[in-house]
Amino acid sequence: ERIYPAAGGGHQIVTVPCSGVRKGAERTVAVADGVVYYLGNDGVYAFDGSMPVCVSRALGDKRYTGGVAGGESGRYWLSAVDAAGETELLVYDTQKRLWHRQDNTAAVAFARWNGEMTVLCSDGRLLDTSGTLGTAETGFSWSAESGDLGLYTPEHKYLSRLELRLKAAAGSTVKAYVCYDGDNVWEQVGGVSGEAGQT
C-alpha cells in the first residue's frame, strides 16, 4: 500500500497489487546495494521502493520454494530450495545483472564478518565468498550458458557467426558448444587451450 499525504489532510491510501515474499521464503529477503531482493511465487524480485521487478527470468522455468539469502555490495546470494528439496547456490551480480549458479551448497545462514560475506553451510562448514580467508581452491570445471540468441529480435534473424572473447589461464582448456533451434543436443564447435598472455 502507498500513502499519498495531502496538505489539507485528505490523505489517500492506494493498494497496488504486486508479488510479495513467497510463503515460507522469508529468509530470502536481503538488501544489496540499497535494493531489497526476495523470492516471490514466480521468481526472485528486486524492490527499490517503487514496484517489485522479477530479475530471475534468466534462470529459466525452474521454480524455487524457499531458501536463505544474504546481500552485500554488488551481490545477492541465494541458497534456493526447489520443490524436490534440491538446493542450488545462486549469485546475482547486481551491477551486471547476471545470475551465476555456483553449486549445490545448502546454506543455513549468510552473515557479514569483518567486511566479508560468510556462509554457514548445513554440514557445519563456514565459507568465505571473497576468497581472502582459508585456502585457495585448485582448478575446477564450470560452464556459462547464454539464452536464445537472435530469435526474439523484431526481424527474427538467425546468427551466422558468433565470436567469443576470453582470457583463459595458462594450462586451461575452453570448449564451445552450440544447440540449434532448442533441440537440446549440444555440439562442440570449437575450443582453445590457454597460454600465457593470450586472449
Task: Identify what each model region corresponds to.
Residues 21-35, 41-199:
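Beta-sheet repeat architectures centered on beta-propellers
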Residues 1-17:
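Surface-exposed extracellular loop regions of Gram-negative outer-membrane beta-barrel proteins
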